[in-house]
Amino acid sequence: MSQKSSLLETSIEKIVSGSIAEEVGMEIGDRVLAVNDQEIEDALDFQYKLSLFPNSLTIKLLKSSGELWNVDIEKEEEEDLGLELESIQTRICDNNCIFCFVHQLPRGKQVRRTLRIKDEDFRFSFLYGHYLTLTNLSEKDFQRIFEQRLSPLYVSVHATDPKLRKYLLQNTKPDNLLKNMDRLIKNGIKLHTQIVLIPEINDGLNLERSIQQLLQFYPKVITLSIIPVGLTDHRQGLPKLKSVDAQYAQKTIHHVSKIQREIKQSHGTPFCFLGDEFYILAGEKIPPRSHYGDFPLVENGVGMVRNFIDDFHKELVQPREEPIIPIQGTIVTGRIFFPILKKYINEMNKTLKIDLRCIAVDNHYFGKGINVAGLLTGQDIFTTSKEQLYGDFLVVPSESMTGSQNLFLDNWTCSDLEKHLGVPVWGGGFQVSEFFKSILLKIHSKNSVHVI
C-alpha cells in the first residue's frame, strides 16, 4: 500500500462532541500515525491497536497544519475515544475471472459506483463477509491476519485443481491456494469457501474433487457454498459460457445431494451447500431449516429463502386487528423470487384480509440471465409497474436501493417512481418483520410516503 493511501485511511473523519478525542485537541482531518509507537494502517488496525492498550496510550498525530503531536491519554477500559477514521480504501482485484460480474456491466449506462469495484481485500472479508481469492496477499498481510486473528475469512475457490483455477481466474501469478489455506488454518484462521459453478467447466468430477479436497480441512474450513454463475447480456469479447437452466439445476441438485448425504453421515454436516437459486430454478422444495445449521451463508444466497419462509409463517400467526381501511397495493420482486413471494403474499391476503398483488420485474438492464431482486433498476421497475400497477402504493425491494435517497443502481430514486406512477413507493425492508410493518402501517398513513 502506498504512503498516500495509508495516510488517507488514517485521517480522522468524525469527532464526537464532548469526547476524549475532542478534549485532547484532535480535529477532523488530523491523521493518526501510531498508537504507542505502533504504526496504524487503517480503521480496523486502529481498533485492534486500541484494544492492546485499553487504559494508557500515546497517539502520534499529524495535524492538518503539518505539526506532529504526541497525545498522552489515560482512560477507563470501557471508555471510547470518540473518533472515527476514514473508510478503508478498497484493494482492487488483479484477477480477470472469466465470469467476473464487473466485466459484464452494460457499457454507456449509469451504474452504481460500487458495482464497478473489483475488491480483493482481506479486511472486507473479515468485516463484511466479502469473498477473496487469496491471490494478492503479501507476507505482511498474512502476519497481520495471524496477529489480529481476522477470522473467519471468506475464500473464493472455484476449483482446487491448479490448472483449472488458473483458467478461471485468468491470473498468471503463482497461486498456491491449498498451501495458503493450510497456512491460514494452522495459524488459527477459520474459513468459509465458495465455488461459482459454471456448466461444463468446474462441475462434475472437478466439483467432486474440489469438495473432497476442501473437506479435508474441515472443521477449520467451515462451509462450502456452491453458487450458480450469473451471466448478463453484455459479454462481448468475453469467453462463451453456458448459463444455469432448470434442467442443469435439477442435475446439480441430484449430484450434490448425494455428496451431502455421504458427508453428513461421516462428518455430521452437509458441509457443501447449494445456493437457493438452484432449488427455485429446478422447481424443487427448499431444504428444511435443519439443513442450514445456524445459517452462516444467508448473505451469499444460501438459506435465505428458508429463512424467509419460516419468518413469514411466524409473522402471519401474530395476533393483529383486521384493517379498518382497505389495503390494496402492488409488491414487486425479481423473476427468481417471484413464485415464492407470490405464494406467501396470497397467504398474507387471506389471513389478514388485505389485497396485495405481486408482480415480477424482468431485468432488461443486465439481461434475462440476471433475475435477483437486488439488481433491479428503477427504470425496469417503472416499465413493468406502469402496465400492472394495482391499488394505492408500490413496494419495492430494499436491497435494490442504497443511501438516504433510496437510489437504484441506474440512479433512479423512489421519488422518481412516485412521480412517474402517481402513487407512494417505498422499500419493503430487509427482514420479514419489516415487510409486514411497511404494509400494515399504511392503515394509519395511507397517503404518506413511508420508506423502510
What are these regions (language model features)?
Residues 1-7, 11-12, 283-452:
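Radical SAM enzyme core and accessory elements
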Residues 16-21, 42-44:
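Short alpha-helix capping/helix-loop boundary micro-motifs
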Residues 21, 29-32, 46, 59, ...:
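Terminal peptide-recognition signature
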Residues 23-41:
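Conserved PDZ fold ligand-binding element
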Residues 47-84:
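PDZ-domain C-terminal substructure recognizer with occasional recognition of PDZ-binding tails
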Residues 67-68, 75-220, 230-259:
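Conserved Radical SAM active-site core
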Residues 152-154, 190-192, 223-225, 271-273, ...:
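Structural preference for beta-strand elements that scaffold enzyme active sites
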Residues 200-201, 221-247, 266-290, 363-368, ...:
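Flexible glycine/acidic-rich beta-alpha junction loops that bind and position SAM and/or redox cofactors
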